[in-house]
From Swiss-Prot:
Subunit structure: Homodimer.
Presence of keyword DNA-binding: no
Pfam families linked to this entry: QueF, QueF_N
Job of this protein: Catalyzes the NADPH-dependent reduction of 7-cyano-7-deazaguanine (preQ0) to 7-aminomethyl-7-deazaguanine (preQ1).
Catalytic activity: 7-aminomethyl-7-carbaguanine + 2 NADP(+) = 7-cyano-7-deazaguanine + 2 NADPH + 3 H(+)
GO molecular function, one term: preQ1 synthase activity
Gene of this entry: queF
The protein's name in its UniProt record: NADPH-dependent 7-cyano-7-deazaguanine reductase
Length: 282
């Protein structure tokens, strides 16, 4: 259990509660969660964050009516800056998007601007939104994370409780290496409902070599851990930085979609540029 799982800031969320679905535009459906909830226990404040980054959302179930009442569909791409006061709670985001379904908008640009304005207000930070017509995306290949996959190891695991113990003494030698490691075994659980969240993770670093078995055991230990996607990525970044002390570090996770949304947070202390193609499970 996360130390803040029962925090009063989470009391008003619709997540985990019976909810009415509205199909007429209602910006009040959006709900934010303070990023400070997970950052404070990690000793991170707005003026000492060791990373930059964003939360990348893909909106697969986005539809509205044009001025003549004809339904429109698009795939949305949202980037929420890491400096925002709040992250966006995903169920509220889904309910908010549903409220577009029977609402008329004059132009696609009006829809984009509406999304951007409302998300900025909820997050209290910088947000960018792009809308894609389906023919722009058709035929795009399934992408893959560049790097060495560490999943195929002949090891036995019987502990699935989160711990940073595996990262202690996880580096060896004085030689500096630069490598990108990938795992598809990341599984955590929703902070509120405890439903499983499935993800692939890419860890790119320069520094003393990280023991791959210990790193994999650490990632697998998230299996019973309850936090939102964004919080898990920041925890992983902070833990690796703290225990392994690489010179540079980038952590990027792409999670499977739920409710027509996927969330793909990344954090880095270098000039990392995330690839945004969807992975095989997305």
């Amino acid at each position: 259990m996360s130390s803040y799982e029962n925090h009063q800031a989470l009391d008003g969320l619709t997540l985990g509660k019976s909810t009415d679905y509205r199909d007429n535009y209602d910006a009040s459906l959006l709900q934010g969660v303070p990023r400070s909830l997970n950052r404070d226990p990690l000793g991170l404040t707005a003026d000492n964050l060791p990373f930059h980054g964003a939360d990348i959302w893909t909106l697969y179930e986005l539809s509205w009516l044009n001025s003549q009442g004809l339904p429109q569909v698009a795939v949305g791409h949202v980037e929420l800056d890491y400096t925002s006061v709040n992250l966006i709670e995903s169920k509220s985001f889904k309910l908010y998007l549903n409220s577009f379904n029977q609402t008329r908008f004059d132009t696609w640009e009006t829809v984009r601007q509406t999304l951007e304005r409302d998300l900025r207000a909820c997050a209290q930070g910088s947000v960018s939104v792009r809308l894609h017509r389906l023919d722009e995306l058709e035929g795009q290949p399934v992408a893959h994370f560049h790097g060495t996959c560490i999943d195929d190891q002949d090891i036995s695991i019987d502990n699935y409780q989160f711990t940073t113990d595996y990262l202690q003494h996880a580096v060896s030698g004085e030689k500096q290496v630069e490598e990108t490691l990938v795992s598809h075994l990341l599984k955590s659980n929703c902070l509120i409902t405890h439903q499983p969240d499935w993800g692939s993770i890419q860890i790119q670093y320069r520094g003393r070599k990280i023991d791959r078995e210990k790193l994999l055991r650490y990632l697998v230990s998230f299996r019973h851990h309850n936090e939102f996607h964004e919080q898990c990525v920041e925890r992983i970044f902070n833990d690796i930085l703290r225990f392994c002390q690489p010179e540079t570090l980038s952590v990027y996770a792409r999670y499977t979609r739920r409710g027509g949304l996927d969330i793909n947070p990344w954090r880095s202390n270098t000039d990392f540029v995330p690839a945004t193609g969807r992975l095989a499970r997305q």
